[in-house]
């Protein structure tokens, strides 16, 4: 496939009167802001002439200082996290231990003489980027497309949007980083192809399989690790230097490790005073990390159905490491594409998408996917999957549910995320209740539940009860994040326990059907005794006792067989009119509808 490289112009022609939106890559290590006009991209430089602005924030002399490599680092890793997760994750705790307010019930940091939430602190970085761009463009900026890791969940995405909003931005769209990178490559709209985007940033790793056809950039599958990136390579090298040369585990040693890593991308050895490390040693140190990324990429390819890929697109500064290119080629035997500066590919894509949203000039369309299945808890703890893993978004799905017991005046909805069959094994996202329903017999209420994921990956759930005209809607904003380790565990457990889960679900469904049948028939007998003789009532009770014994035995096959026996014998021996009533009850009709 022909690749069209988007080259940055020395001086793009941005007219003051035209509407402008920026693209922002809020990175773990570095952040960038760019604008596009007529498909020409310009990365905005900082006041000290840097395109890559370190994502660090310090507070000195009553002022925030951005990008001086001091103070709080890697704030991106904190988006969507709870205090409990921070305390239980050493890598995260080490980032914030000097700022953490452990007495708070939620995640707050002692910063700028205040207790601030993560979005409030991150907003200062967005403000800095905004100010730099406004100063150079001599215009106010209010609209932005912002990139996020493909595996950022609802909570993390919501906090990114909140931080940008605090900074004065209207977020036109959140776009997954691999998708933005593919867009930046400007794949020819008249060509077709399937690409693997390998995005190893400073603190996150994402991989996506994209199908590009006539301007449509469709994500088929996505995978990643929100706690793996180039910073982890730096840490491994730092540990080696500390152990080998008896150096302190300090910021200076970390900076030395980064310098060694960068030097060894184009040289065979690195020497600094009494410290030395060669390329072979470096590759031995980081090979386990690289192999982790390759495994994740292969999993993603399997999730996509193992399509033939036309190339691997490299994104992120860490991909300059020669070992990564070598291992990718070994694994996929396909061209490795790195035409665009890997540090800029994501922000270029965001800027191009921003331009296209405010002044459409191409027929391009970006379609992303949901990283995990979303569903709802039913009676008995069963999960009803409503939006499946890797479903293209935006999407809206409507399903109808009813009540299980008589005279319910409210329905509780429990929103879940995960691949398992039972609610206890999935992750709870949110709960809400539809109140004020008229008391009715079980099965009479009809509630329509709508799950909607927008283009930003934000989930909204609404419920509407037709008879009472009652409705309720929420935007799901869980107070916790979900990282790649948990996603992997969910998927692995779903695979390992698939048979157990399926059997558990079959049992629970059989029990629910049996209990509903027993309840309906016993009520029918009480209300329609004039239609039955004593012998017929005796036969019915005997058959119901068999069902009850099967339920007590917790044997789904026995339960199903006893239900079949009940239906068969009732059909053969009961009065025709009562038979019709029984059949209607078995179809879910209310007794008042059929009397």
From Swiss-Prot:
InterPro entries associated with the record: ATPase_NBD, Heat_shock_70_CS, HSP70_C_sf, HSP70_peptide-bd_sf, Hsp_70_fam, ISC_FeS_clus_asmbl_HscA
Task: List all disulphide bridges recorded for this chain.
Answer: none
Provide an example Pfam family for this protein: HSP70
Keyword ATP-binding included in the entry's annotation: yes
Q: What's this chain's function?
A: Chaperone involved in the maturation of iron-sulfur cluster-containing proteins. Has a low intrinsic ATPase activity which is markedly stimulated by HscB.
* Gene3D superfamilies registered for this protein in UniProt: 1.20.1270.10, 3.30.420.40, Actin, Chain A, domain 4, Substrate Binding Domain Of DNAk, Chain A, domain 1
Which GO biological process annotations does it have? Answer: iron-sulfur cluster assembly
> Which PROSITE patterns does the protein's record reference?
HSP70_2
Q: Name one GO molecular function term.
A: unfolded protein binding
Question: How is this protein named in the record?
Answer: Chaperone protein HscA homolog
């Amino acid at each position: 496939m022909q690749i069209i490289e988007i080259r940055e112009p020395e001086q793009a022609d941005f007219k003051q009167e035209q509407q402008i939106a920026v693209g922002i890559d809020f990175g773990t290590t570095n952040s960038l802001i760019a604008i596009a006009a007529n498909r020409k991209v310009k990365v905005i430089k900082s006041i000290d002439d840097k395109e890559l602005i370190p994502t660090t924030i310090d507070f000195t002399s009553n002022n925030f200082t951005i990008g001086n490599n001091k103070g709080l680092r890697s704030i991106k890793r904190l988006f969507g996290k709870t205090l409990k997760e921070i305390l239980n994750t050493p890598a995260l705790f080490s980032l914030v231990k000097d700022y953490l307010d452990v007495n708070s019930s939620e995640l707050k940091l002692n910063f700028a003489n205040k207790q601030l939430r993560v979005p409030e602190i991150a907003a200062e970085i967005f403000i800095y980027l905004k100010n730099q761009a406004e100063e150079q463009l001599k215009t106010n900026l209010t609209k932005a497309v912002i990139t996020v890791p493909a595996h950022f969940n609802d909570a993390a995405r919501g906090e990114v949007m909140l931080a940008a909003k605090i900074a004065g931005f209207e977020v036109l769209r959140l776009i997954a980083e691999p998708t933005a990178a593919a867009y930046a490559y400007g794949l020819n709209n008249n060509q077709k192809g399937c690409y693997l985007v390998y995005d190893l940033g400073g603190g996150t790793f994402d991989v996506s399989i994209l199908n590009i056809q006539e301007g449509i950039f469709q994500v088929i599958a996505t995978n990643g690790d929100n706690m793996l990136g180039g910073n982890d390579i730096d840490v491994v090298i730092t540990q080696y230097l500390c152990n080998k040369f008896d150096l302190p585990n300090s910021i200076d040693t970390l900076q030395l490790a980064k310098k060694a890593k960068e030097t060894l991308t184009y040289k065979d050895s690195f020497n600094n005073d009494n410290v030395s490390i060669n390329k072979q040693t470096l590759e031995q140190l980081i090979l386990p990390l690289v192999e982790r990324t390759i495994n994740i990429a292969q999993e993603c390819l399997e999730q996509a159905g193992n399509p033939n890929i036309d190339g691997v697109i490299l994104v992120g500064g860490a991909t300059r490491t020669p070992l990564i290119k070598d291992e990718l080629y070994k694994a996929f035997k396909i061209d490795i594409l790195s035409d665009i500066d890997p540090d800029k590919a994501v922000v270029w894509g965001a800027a191009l998408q921003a331009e296209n949203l405010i002044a459409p000039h191409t027929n391009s369309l970006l379609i992303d996917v949901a990283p995990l299945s979303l569903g709802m808890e039913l009676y008995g703890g069963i999960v009803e999957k409503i939006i499946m893993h890797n479903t293209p978004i935006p999407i809206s799905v409507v399903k109808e549910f009813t009540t299980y017991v008589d005279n319910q005046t409210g329905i509780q909805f429990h929103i879940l995320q995960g691949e398992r069959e039972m609610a206890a094994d999935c992750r709870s996202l949110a709960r809400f209740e539809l109140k004020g329903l008229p008391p009715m017999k079980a099965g009479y209420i009809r509630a329509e539940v709508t799950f909607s994921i927008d283009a930003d990956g934000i989930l909204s759930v609404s419920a509407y009860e037709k008879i009472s005209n009652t409705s309720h809607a929420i935007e799901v904003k869980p107070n916790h994040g979900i990282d790649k380790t948990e996603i992997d565990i969910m998927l692995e457990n779903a695979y390992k326990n698939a048979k157990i889960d399926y059997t558990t679900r079959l049992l629970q469904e059989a029990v629910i059907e049996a209990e509903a049948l027993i309840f309906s028939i016993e009520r029918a007998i009480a209300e329609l005794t004039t239609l039955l003789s004593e012998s017929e009532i005796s036969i019915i009770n005997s058959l119901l006792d068999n069902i009850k014994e099967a339920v007590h035995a917790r044997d789904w096959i026995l339960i199903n067989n006893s239900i079949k026996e009940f239906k068969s014998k009732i059909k053969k021996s009961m009065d025709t009119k009562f038979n019709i009533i029984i059949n209607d009850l078995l179809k879910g009709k209310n007794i008042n509808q059929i009397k």
